Each structure stands twice: as C-alpha cells, then as structure tokens.
C-alpha cells in the first residue's frame, strides 16, 4: 500500500525531536545507548521536490512553482507517494520560481521571477510537507538587476547569492564627419553593460553592486559580436574571482540588423575580482564553442581546485570545460559529450557533480524525439577525471520527458537525487550512487495535466 503524505505535522515533530533530522536506531528491549558505536546511525535530510504547473501550454511552467518536502529515507521509498501540485507550497513567483537550497536542505532560497513581485528575495525554513516558514524579511533587488533576475547561490557555505543582468545598447555608428550621408557611416560596436549584485543570504541584505561595460576583442566587436545574456556566477577555489557565463549574439556590421547566421566563437567567461566585483576581463576557450550561461540550473562548479563549466549550442556538441586556478581555460582538457555518449548534437540542460568528481548530466541531442513541450531529455553519469559519460538506462524515458527547464539536483555524499516524470504524467524520485552507478527508484511523484517536475533541492 502506498503511503500518501498529505500532512507532515506529525513527521515534523518527530524530526525536531530527533534533532535536525538525525535519527539513531534503538531497541527498547535492550536499552541500547544510541550513541554506542555498535548501533548504526542513519543520517537524513530534507528533499524538496519542485514542480512547475502549466500556464497556457503543456510544459511552459508558467502556472506557478509548487514545492513539497520529505526526508531522504522516504524519498528513497517507492511506496511513498506525494502530490506537490495538490498539497504543495506555492513558491512566490509570477512565472517559474528560481529556487536554490542550502547544502543540508534545511533552507530554501527564492527570488521571484517577473511580474509585480519580480526580483523579490525570500528564504524559508524547511519543516516538511508543505510547511515552509519564512525567515527574515523580503529583499527586493529589482532596482539593481530588474524584475526577472538570473541568480544562483555561490558555494561559500550558503552565505552569498549573486544575481546578474546585461543591458544591450543600440549599435554605435561613426558618421565619419558626414552626419547627413548614411552611406559613409561605419559600424563601431554594440555596447553591453553588465550588472552584478551580491546578496547576503544569512541576513537578507544587499552586499555589493557594480556595473561594467565589458568589451570583446577589437576584431570581434568590429564583426558585430556582443554579450547578449549572462548568467550562472561561480566562485573560484581561492574565493577571489567570480566567473560569469555568457552568450554572444551578433549584428551584421553593414546593416546593424540582427545576424543569425554567423560563426560561433570560442566559449567565453567574464572574470571579476571578488568580492569587489571590479576589473572585468574576458577569457576564451580554444576547446569549446558556444554559450556558457546555461539556463535555469547552475552551470559551473568548483572541483579539486578548478571550475568545471558546461557549454551549450556548441556546433560539435556540448563540452564540459575546465578553468584552472590561474583563472584561464585549460585547453588541454577536452571533454566532448558527443564523443563520450556516441551521439550528435549533445546539449547539456543541467548538471551537478558530487565531491568525487562524478556527476549526473541532463541532456538532449539531435535525435531526441520532439515531445509535447520540446525535445526529449535523458540523464547520464559523467566522470570529470576520466572524461567519460554513460546514459543512465535504469531511469525510464518518455518522448514527453522534458528537461529544458530542469533546475535542481540534491547531492548527499556520493549520491545524487533527481526527478523523473513526463509532462502531465506521474514520475518518481531516483537516486544515483555515483561511485557504483547503482540507481534506486524512490518516492512516486503525482502529476497533473500539462505540468512537470523541475528537480529536487
């Protein structure tokens, strides 16, 4: 019989009495000391499932974001059934909320996306089920980065978040001293001004804000290239540089009209001093081409002293790129997902490594079936050290399994939790043991028409 979790007050009380979700097995008949090393201890944490409700079209996620939490033991139990859309907490956001969580899963951070409340930061204490208790006051950052900010939590012990935006100006034209003769005009460049704000997650305060005009090389700018989108700030291992992924667009210098048929340049990252957010520079990969801004999931992670970054829209298929401690791309590190998975046009939609350098990657490729909301997605187990990848066949796939909006994985030791479920269909939590590749089918996720699950936190 499936256990339906409709009210978590009882479980919350039990969890609190255990002391921050740490449970020790005991036997009343023997009066064993739960601190005895011979008594096995079971550590647990909250797993928060997020679902994006349909707005107008299946899979658009514009009907709101619903979250619901269970402990990790129940997340691994396929007899448990939860219904986030019927019983969940609505994360404040006009469109799909941009969620982050603390490393231990006890806190959810949210910045509302678009609408009247766009740019509003809130954080919540996770108490189980649909109980999320707001902590502190709201902070609105829209005056710094607009009402639809792109933001992530930096990996600095849950202390800081960083949000970014880019403002693209009209092309700069030199009239060469003859303002009435447009035939003599010369295209100069398209200026892109970036803004970066850092947010104190602990005290709900603005820490810093800076704006910069970030130029490309003279040749690239003369040919019409400019940064059109930035996202996914990431700290280096030393904590003194902030890397920001970027997407380039292009205008035709002869007409200043948008140019969609152009050579894709080497993948680029903007580097700022941290925490000052000053002295912007741009680094370029000679291995990967295309974008490094990702979409809705964190796109770059520090591991073993370097930052590993996914790219998208690469003509040779997505790569995982490496930025070393010298804050430059390591072009000796060549990890191409097309080659590793034996597919064409691999596109990394979201990914997350564990501390052992093994990661779960959500991806699509050129032969993905077109489903009700977009191209079918898959999961792969990746080894950053060996530069290998293998599709996780133990997870079921469906033509309507849509991962483009996927946001969150939970890392617990060497285990990675994820959600599976086609648009409008029930699914499950799955847990991947990255050391062995073993996959555990966990709790059932109950869906509603046109909606989909966007991860766990």
Regions found by a protein language model. Give the residues of each.
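Short, conserved, GDST-rich strand-edge loop motifs in beta-rich repeat architectures
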Residues: 52-61, 165-192, 240-266, 312-314, ...
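Beta-propeller blade signature
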Residues: 63-73, 121-128, 181-205, 257-277, ...
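Beta-propeller fold detector
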Residues: 76-89, 130-144, 193, 198-222, ...
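Repeated scaffold domains used in trafficking and secretory/extracellular systems
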Residues: 88-101, 141-157, 221-234, 289-302, ...
């Amino acid at each position: 019989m499936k256990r339906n979790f409709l009210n978590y007050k009882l479980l919350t009380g039990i969890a609190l009495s255990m002391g921050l979700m740490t449970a020790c097995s005991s036997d009343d008949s023997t009066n064993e000391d739960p601190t005895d090393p011979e008594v096995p201890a079971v550590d647990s944490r909250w797993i928060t499932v997020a679902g994006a409700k349909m707005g107008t079209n299946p899979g658009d996620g514009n009907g709101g974001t619903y979250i619901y939490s269970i402990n990790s033991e129940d997340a691994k139990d396929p007899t448990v059934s939860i219904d986030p859309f019927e019983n969940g907490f609505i994360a404040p956001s006009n469109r799909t909320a941009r969620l982050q969580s603390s490393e231990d899963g006890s806190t959810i951070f949210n910045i509302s996306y678009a609408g009247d409340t766009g740019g509003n930061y809130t954080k919540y204490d996770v108490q189980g089920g649909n109980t999320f208790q707001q902590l502190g006051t709201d902070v609105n950052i829209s005056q710094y980065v607009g009402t639809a900010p792109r933001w992530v939590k930096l990996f600095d012990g849950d202390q800081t978040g960083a949000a970014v935006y880019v403002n693209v100006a009209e092309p700069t034209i030199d009239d060469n001293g003859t303002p009435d003769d447009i035939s003599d005009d010369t295209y100069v460049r398209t200026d892109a001004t970036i803004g970066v704000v850092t947010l104190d997650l602990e005290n709900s305060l603005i820490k810093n804000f800076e704006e910069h005009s970030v130029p490309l090389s003279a040749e690239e700018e003369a040919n019409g290239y400019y940064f059109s989108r930035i996202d996914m700030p990431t700290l280096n291992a030393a904590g003194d540089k902030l890397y920001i992924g970027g997407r380039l667009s292009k205008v035709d210098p002869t007409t200043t009209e948008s140019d969609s048929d152009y050579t894709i340049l080497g993948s680029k990252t903007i580097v700022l001093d941290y925490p000052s957010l000053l002295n912007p520079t741009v680094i370029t990969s000679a291995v990967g081409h295309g974008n490094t801004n990702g979409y809705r999931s964190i796109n770059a992670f520090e591991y073993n002293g370097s930052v590993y970054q996914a790219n998208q829209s690469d003509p040779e298929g997505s790569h995982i790129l490496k930025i070393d401690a010298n804050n430059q791309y390591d072009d000796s590190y060549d990890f191409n997902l097309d080659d590793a998975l034996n597919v064409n046009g691999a596109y990394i939609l979201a990914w997350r490594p564990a501390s052992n350098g093994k990661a779960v990657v959500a991806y699509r490729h050129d032969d993905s079936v077109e489903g009700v909301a977009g191209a079918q997605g898959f999961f792969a187990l990746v080894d950053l050290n060996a530069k290998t990848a293998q599709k996780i066949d133990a997870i079921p796939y469906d033509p309507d399994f849509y991962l483009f909006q996927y946001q969150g994985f939970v890392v617990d030791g060497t285990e990675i939790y994820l959600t599976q479920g086609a648009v409008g269909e029930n699914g499950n939590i799955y847990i991947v043991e990255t050391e062995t590749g073993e996959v555990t089918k966990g709790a059932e996720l109950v869906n509603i028409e046109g909606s989909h699950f966007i991860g766990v936190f």
